Each structure stands twice: as structure tokens, then as C-alpha cells.
Amino acid sequence: NDAVASLVHVIEGKDPRGVVGLWKDMVDWVHKGNNEGAVNGAIAAIDVALWDLKAKIADEPLWRTLGAREGRAKAYASDIGYNLSDEELHAFYSRMADVGVDGGKIKVGLNMKDDLRRIGIMRDAFRKVKDRPYLMIDSNEYWSAKQSIRYINEIEKHYEIFWAEEPARRWDFDGLRQVSRNVSAAVASGENLNDIGQMYPLISQQAIDIANVGVGHSGITGARQVSNMCYAYEIPVTMMNCPANFMAPLAAALPNHNMMEVVDPGREGAFDSWDNHIEDGWIVMGNKPGLGIEVNEDKIKAMQAVDFGRKPGFPFPRREGAALWIKDIEPGEVSWK
């Protein structure tokens, strides 16, 4: 909230329809300190709100304002490290398969035996939709580049992997390129970078085969910039997950978008309604003006007052032992989270 408040004076009194220009004003304002951390999140939040307002002023859905031909984007399912049991994991992917989703992503990295078993559970759940479902793995920068080559090659003896996500550090374009050239799966990365400047080395150095894009790339405007640059290099993009799939309108408008990450419903507790649903494996958007999301401020205040008994995981530290080669699983540690 403080970061958002610090940017209000930059755009106050200006025409909200000039979203791209207002985005540049905000990015230029934080030039010296750089577009990082809470400031990046604030710029992203304001940018999304401005795009929502621009579409509402035009009395049309945001996907149309952004230039999409139709209001839909292909979906894939992701467990995003919810620490599900084998049975819960199968139930989750099976529910997504029931609405036509034909691929999924799962966390890997700590234990090959568990990884292989759980990839199999994911594959079996999606086989009700497709005999060869799209299977993605995400090691969240836990492995070194050489470890990734070793482990991904082993996984590929058992499964056809569509892409391997973050198999090296986000900024290590040499390592990512090394992995890409030594495994069959496509290499995806970029979700933890902030803007087009940080993404450029990965793209220009042919370090990634697929780019993760999302609201974290400085909002809709920044994510579209990254995606357009990827288009020039024939690199497809995949949209990251977000509550109520609010980035789906941009995904629908990108000519090089392949699939958007979706998670099990339940993170929309602050919304009264949202104008999209999953059907036949696609996020289908309606025609309500703007994002089509109704936010309930009272629900937000009520959620802020809840004591969950623990602090949230943010800022999501890197797991102990990453890239050290010697980390064993501790007693009681969940080996797939």
C-alpha cells in the first residue's frame, strides 16, 4: 500500500486511457532505485487497474481492448507446491481434466523416486483427456545447470516432458542455454524477472525456449513488452497464474502465447464475481467491461484481520542446499514441496 501511495502523484490528474504513457512515467520515476521489489508490484497493480479502467471507459471487455480476436486462452494445471498427498494430487489434476485441461506442471527437485512417481500420477490423471498429455516440471532454481541436465535426462527416460522450468538461476543465461542444448524438453524461465531489460539477455542469448510472463513483469504493459520481444525471436510465452485468472485477457491477445497456468479455485476470496471459467481446456472470458472482476473491500478487510497462526512464506526464500549437490532430505521433510 505504501509503494502504491508513493506513485499516486506521478499519475494523478492525467487521462487514465493513456496507460502505456502512464506506465512509462512510473518506471521513469523509480529510475535510480530501479523497478524492483515492492515498487515493481505497485507499478504492476496500478497498471492493471488502469487497463481495467480503460476498457470500462470503452464499455468493452479488456481482452477486446488489448486486441484479442476472441476471449479465450488455453489453460494448463499447476499444483504450485501445495504439498498435496498422492491422492490429493491425482484428485486435483483429475478435476482439471474433467473440464478439458490436457496438461499440467509439478514441482520436482529433491527426490528422484518421488518425482518420477508423482509425474506419473499427473500423467495418469490427464490421460482421460489425452493419451500424451503435456507434462511440465518446475525445479524453481534448486538445481545447478549440470544437475539439471543429469536429472532431466533421467526423467526423460520415463516421460515425455514438454518443458522444464527454472532449471538454473533466473539470470544465468549461459547455464540455461547449456541445459536447453542438452535435454529434449524445452527450457522455460523468466517468472522472477521484472521487466524487458532483465529478460533481454535470456532471449537474445537463446537461453530459453519458452518465456514465463506475468503481472510481475511490471503489469500488463510490461508483460506485453516482454511477449512482443519474444515474438521477434520466435519464442512462445506462457502466462503465470494469478487470482481469478486476471491476466487471461492479455494471454488471449498475444500471438505467441501457448498456455496459461491455472490453479485450483479458492484464491478468489476477496472477489464477489469474476467473468471467466474453464471449458474444454480453455479459459473462456465473458463480455463484462474491463476485467469483469467485482472486488469486495469488506472481504479484504475481513481477511486482513484473520490470524492464521503463522506468517506467510513471503519472500519465499531459496531452499537450503540448493545447487550444493550434497543436500539430503531431512527427517520429516516433505520431499516434493
How would you describe each model-predicted region?
Residues L7, I46, D59, M122, ...:
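Conserved, mostly hydrophobic/aromatic
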Residues G13, E60, A185, I235, ...:
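Short glycine/serine/threonine/alanine-rich loop segments
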Residues A58-G81:
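N-terminal small/glycine-rich loop or linker at the start of catalytic domains
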Residues D79-H90, M112, L116:
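Active-site beta->alpha loop and helix N-cap motifs at the rims of alpha/beta catalytic domains
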Residues R95-K107:
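Catalytic domains of carbohydrate-active enzymes, especially glycoside hydrolases
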Residues I106-N241:
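Catalytic core of soluble alpha/beta enzymes
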Residues C242-K337:
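Flexible C-terminal active-site loop/helix
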